[in-house]
Amino acid sequence: LLSLLLFLTPMRFNHDGGMIYHINHGFDNKQSFRNPERDIQVNGPVLNFLNYIDLQVMNKPANYSPSAINHLDEKYKKVATDINKGRKNNVKKQTVIFNLSESFVDPYTFPTVKIDKSAPNPVKFIQSMKGRSTYGNMLSAGYGGGTANMEWETLTGLNMGMFKSTLTPYVQVVPNYSFYPTIGMNFGYSSAVHPFIGTYYSRIEDYHRFKFNKFAYLGSKYKIIDQKKLGKSSYNSDYTTYDNGIKQINERKGGQFINLISIQNHMPYNNWYPRNEYMGRVSGDLFNTAAVRSQMATYIKGTQYTDKAVKKFIGQIDKIHKPITLVFYGDHYPSVLSQSFTAQYPVQMHSTRYFIYSNRYAREHGAKTKLPTRTNNYVNTSDFIAMMLQQTNSKVTPYQALLTEIHKELPAITINFNGDKGYELINEHGHPVEYKTLTKKQKALINDYEMIQYDMTAGKAYGLKAKGFYK
């Protein structure tokens, strides 16, 4: 009997309400699923192994059913109708680029960092975007990694903070569905471009589930042009990324969606660049070893190259006579500083730079220059769909109406940066907001959001059967 119990234990270890679940918690098992290293220290290796062997994606909402999803469809159809009265554009006719800039953070926002004033500002152009685009801080669910999770959030509008467990949706969620809804489905043509290997995070398989028309990567049937590496770095530069972005823009006459993923500033940061003017000019309390200062100087030089490449790219799209909107975002902090410092600077070390820029032609045809600062200083990656649709003055579907209401009415929703279960709410000043302070309307929005996310991560995808909900 004992042997049978031990055999069956992993199968129900994390399932609420069962006998094994209660035995598990009788051992004072403190599950967080956010920080595996800390979990081992708190729970020991055996309990931690059992915690992770049978992950629950989300708790099932009490009233989850086809009728519950249909109710939300009807509810947000009405919201979409109201929103669309003030919108005139069809996003399908736009060219929209979601540009994941690998590990991009404004170097001046690192905690305690000091860059010698004699050194040039490495990100002067990107900082200048504050005055002519929607611009602010993006809250990342990762530190030094988690690229695919940020990409999943941008494409789906769903949120890592809603998960019960630490997981990678591209690997552990998306493959469970034959089709997976993304912003790309709202366009007649969608593609992804990545001047690196395409197999990481099951991207090739998942983009098929997204019904992307094309994925250009190193070794694919679609050639990556103008491959250029900087200094001793083994990664293709951001110039390569944007040259291929321009190529894709010019290949289509009408609107399209492009998921543009860079690689230049990926770790490690091993003094790649000759004539690096930031070497010896970086200091700060957290930059207390020669090795860390050298890595930071290398990273800063990389951001300078990014800044120049972005400036060139925006100059190019401004000359193109079709509406183009660029959503630029850093996916996470680089792994220069020890992750242990995130406990001291939880929000700061999970905040990257983002901006949303609509080219001259788009602005001449109804797109906004920038959105109100109040709701955009701190955002989550999952907010980008709603923000892009607002900036391009595009009509929304019922699902996008839900995302729009969440962005407008709620603080930014993100993972709990302290490593605890559940999501965290961050206001426009970068400060946590307690759930109990939310209004009834705000709490209802979160409940609706959780229901839809459960449906497309652990549920039966009833929303796909509701005509027009996603598209």
Predicted features and spans:
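N-terminal secretory/membrane-targeting segments
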Residues: L1-K93, K117-G136, P169-Y177, Q304, ...
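Solvent-exposed soluble domains appended to multi-pass membrane proteins
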Residues: K78-R87, L100-S101, D106-K471
